[in-house]
């Protein structure tokens, strides 16, 4: 009896389907290349490495800023609800929102997608979200990797990682050393949960039937703050900033305040979203909520009080910043007052 020959496809890796996906990427990336043609090489797609002409960036004393991140176990809910069109936006947001904390303009983005089995339509939706996120951020998707890994991932499982690079003038860079006594702390609303705390959420909904409204809120894409923050830095309106991710409001804001000054926060001023009230109703205490979720605040600014009204003009009605605290000289590193009004 003749033995059947082993092939890569039989082991679970479909090169033909992977090539088809690469061709799809090349096709939909043409518009992006045309839009950014003075920076990008039209031959980036399919090359071993991607190029970006930084000599065309007219910034004095430029500093390169980089960030890499993922979307954590939010991907499991995308699988559970069979909805993949927003998770790519999350991936871009988690990277570029970190760049703008230092005032950097995102230049380009690369993605890494690992799957147990290539599912073309699902990957198309994920990629469309990534491109949408790049368009919102005004940065270029210049490369990436899609890895099919049977045996490492279940055939229905996948993971995402992103990498982004930005640039900022040395004089325009946001830094905690710019923060001064008397500065005001402003909260910018989040669009929802963003991309942190999903392991806890998954444990909450494991044996529950949830409504369509809750499903929609659980997968709402992370707000990208690039346009607003870059306008503020361009006009020298803010001193420091914080992206509110894992660790929550207090821990992330503390990273943006110098050691010799005190962060004063009034939690009663925080305007929380309905989804967080729903999460808390599942027997989660205040401390756990604050350490795990953004609780309605996706990004924070530290600025001179006199700049508050000017700052607000750069935001749409839904995302207008509001005061939640101030900076002072104090023996304490931080003073936290009151509780969030759920």
Where do the PLM segments sit?
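Glycine-/charge-enriched secondary-structure boundary and capping motifs
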Residues: 2-12, 21, 27, 122-137, ...
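General beta-strand structural signal in soluble alpha/beta enzymes
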Residues: 41-44, 64-67, 108-109, 140-145, ...
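N-terminal glycine-rich phosphate/pyrophosphate-binding loops that anchor nucleotide-derived ligands
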Residues: 2-100, 138-139, 150-151, 180, ...
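A glycine-rich phosphate/pyrophosphate-binding beta-strand-loop-alpha-helix module
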Residues: 80-159
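Phosphate/diphosphate-binding glycine-rich loops and adjacent basic-rich segments that engage nucleotide
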Residues: 150, 154-209
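Beta-strand segments within the central parallel beta-sheet cores of soluble alpha/beta enzyme folds
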Residues: 64, 107-114, 127, 142-145, ...
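Acidic, glycine-rich active-site loops and adjacent beta-strand->loop/helix elements
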Residues: 69-72, 112-118, 145-151, 166-168, ...
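A generic local secondary-structure boundary/capping motif
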Residues: 39-40, 52-56, 97-98, 131, ...
């Amino acid at each position: 009896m003749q033995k059947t020959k082993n092939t890569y496809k039989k082991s679970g890796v479909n090169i033909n389907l992977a090539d088809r996906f690469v061709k799809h990427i090349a096709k939909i990336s043409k518009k992006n290349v045309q839009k950014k043609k003075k920076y990008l090489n039209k031959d980036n797609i399919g090359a071993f490495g991607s190029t970006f002409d930084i000599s065309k960036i007219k910034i004095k004393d430029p500093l390169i800023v980089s960030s890499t991140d993922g979307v954590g176990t939010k991907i499991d809910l995308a699988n559970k609800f069979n909805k993949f069109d927003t998770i790519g936006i999350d991936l871009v947001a988690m990277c570029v929102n970190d760049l703008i904390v230092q005032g950097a303009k995102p230049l380009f983005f690369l993605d890494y997608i690992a799957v147990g089995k290539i599912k073309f339509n699902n990957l198309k939706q994920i990629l469309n979200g990534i491109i949408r996120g790049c368009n919102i951020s005004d940065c270029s998707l210049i490369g990436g990797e899609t890895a099919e890994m049977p045996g490492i991932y279940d055939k229905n499982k996948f993971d995402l990682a992103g990498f982004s690079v930005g640039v900022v003038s040395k004089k325009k860079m946001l830094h905690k050393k710019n923060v001064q006594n008397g500065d005001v702390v402003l909260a910018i609303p989040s669009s929802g949960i963003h991309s942190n705390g999903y392991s806890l959420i998954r444990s909450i909904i494991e044996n529950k039937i949830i409504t369509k409204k809750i499903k929609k809120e659980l997968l709402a894409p992370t707000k990208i703050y690039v346009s607003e923050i870059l306008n503020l830095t361009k006009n020298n309106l803010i001193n420091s900033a914080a992206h509110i991710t894992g660790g929550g409001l207090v821990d992330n804001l503390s990273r943006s305040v110098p050691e010799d000054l005190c962060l004063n926060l009034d939690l009663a001023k925080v305007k929380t979203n309905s989804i967080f009230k729903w999460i808390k109703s599942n027997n989660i205490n205040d401390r756990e909520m604050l350490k795990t979720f953004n609780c309605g605040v996706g990004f924070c600014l530290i600025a001179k009080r006199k700049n508050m009204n000017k700052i607000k003009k750069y935001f749409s009605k839904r995302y207008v910043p509001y005061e939640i605290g101030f900076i002072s000289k104090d023996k304490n590193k931080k003073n936290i007052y009151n509780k969030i009004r759920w």
